Amino acid sequence: MKKKKVISTLGVIALSASLVTPVFAQQPETSPGTPDEQVLSVEGFTNHEQLGKKLQQIAKSSQGKVQVEVAGYSNRGREIYKATVGQGDKVILLESEIHGNEPTGTEAILNILQFLGTNSPEAQKIREEVTIVALPKMNPDASELSRRGNDLTWAEVVEDFPQLASVRPTWNYYIYQNQTFDYASQPGFDVNRDFNPNLDYVPQPEDFPGNSSQPGWFITPESQVVRDVYKDLQAEFGKVDVFVDLHHQAPYYEVEGTDDLVTFSISGQFVPDPSTTEKYAEYADTYDYDFSRQLNVAVFDALQEKGNANISLYPQGLDLPGTALGTFALNGSGAVLFEVRGQTQSMGQKKKGELVKAVERGLYGIINGVADGTVYDINPEEYESIPLTKGRQ
């Protein structure tokens, strides 16, 4: 991996200007009722070049409060940025656009970084209590292509891992073509199935091609960068208290018991509880499902306070250890999934402002709850009362 480049908050070194779904990743990225042939504008979302410039501006205007660096590089050599703000003992790791057609999380992260870099008393209090680390647009190759999968061929994987020369490609390797996406000529992987709860795992031929209920392999550069950031935080702080992954889903799900379209769904369950199954027994001492549930309730409550009741619970009973959320939950992080309404191929930038603001409010529910300690007083059983998502199975 290329050496990290530190970005000066004074602008001396300029930035380069260049879940999760419970279905098999090989399936096309379309959903019933989704317009496949429309050309929808996405220019209102921040692209990779703009991201670098915006982060530089935030770092400079914060006068050192927000630190930005290049944590690593995508397969096509694009920077994967890491922004850090705060000096508290509790660590919150935020990640967006592990799927490149799911962009609202990046906008929300930028807005939060902008605020937390100010001299506001509220921002100062948060900085004193927590350390927030953000990986916005962590799959930039996919983002530039406005698609789910990254830009990586199986041949390139074998070049990096020669021990895999005789095995079949992984189950999450996209090579299909439909009206919306052409992976046949430009293959890629669902990076969110490439994680492994053993953070020191080295790919072994017998673990391929795998399936959704088995761990991933860290064969993509993007997952390797996130893993390394996570491990560095573990080494520095002892643990990563909270991990939040910001996703999108199809546009027309409803809140159970209503006709209201879901603004976004949330979840804290990605693998079976290690205390109840031998499969993950080695992680029983680190896994903290109650804390994940408390964090999710904090998100739900934050949106209710603002009058947005269209928050639902994502399908439960999942076993997805290859997701970032599954992997980091097993490693002891309280884990939260956001699944925002509509991907770029189905909605473009429609309702962008409304959806970004909702994500921000949900994230502040977590940030404030951890900073002031109120999240630890939440009854985790309240999670079970969050309405389900009608139409998801």
At which residue positions do the language-model features occur?
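C-terminal accessory segments enriched in acidic
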Residues: 1-3, 27-47, 207-393
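Sec-dependent N-terminal signal peptides
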Residues: 5-16
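Sec-dependent signal peptide cleavage junction
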Residues: 17-31
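Soluble metallo-hydrolase cores and metallopeptidase-like ectodomains found primarily
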Residues: 43-90
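Loop/turn elements at helix/coil->beta-strand transitions in domains of secreted/extracellular proteins
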Residues: 64-67, 78, 88-91, 128-133, ...
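Active-site-proximal beta-strand/loop segments in catalytic clefts of secreted hydrolases
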Residues: 71-73, 85, 95-98, 135-139, ...
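Active-site/substrate-binding loop(s) of hydrolase catalytic cores
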Residues: 89, 104, 117-118, 122-280
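Membrane-embedded segments
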Residues: 104-106, 110
